Amino acid sequence: MNAPLISITRSGSDISVASPFHPAFVRRAKELGGKWDAAAKVWTFDARDEDDVRALCCEVYGTDGSPVKLVDVRITYRHAASGDRSAIYSCGREIARAWGRDSGAKLGEGVKLVEGRVRSGGSAKNWETVIDAGSVLVLRDVPEPIALRRVCDKEDRLVEILPSAAATVDVPALQAEREKLVARMAEIDAILSTQTASAA
């Protein structure tokens, strides 16, 4: 299990972002003028807004697709948590989802229930995803930047980063980043070569 896959690609005057669904990302993407491409399943933005788009990805997911240290996070729910007709999110990912009052609830990818229960509830019309009070969940491979921002000891929940022995480095992401950099260097060399030839 690796961190949620975030991919930012430039094509002409646009950039596209492929990322897992997150309501906070959707809301801010629209504010940045992003458009959802249903066929390609990506958000598209004006390439001039790339810095803002990357900042948004880091804010919501903890990474813009660049290699990042991953850690495991433990969340202890002192009070019940619920999502009104929606999933429950934390640390940039979906951690539990119901689909209706009687559907039951399913854990998100890379999430382990250590203690307690996740379930569906509410009414047929206003159903909920519910994490019961006293439940303990472990989220695997969370980007460290967002994990550090979520660490807290509050009345309703305790969020902790597990010991570093559980931390991993996202090797595939590092390899992918290296390939991108090598390709980009080749592009730059080609541009410089063309410019040098033109100047001569």
Tell where the protein language model's regions lie, with residue ranges.
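Accessory DNA-engaging acidic/polar modules
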Residues: 1-200
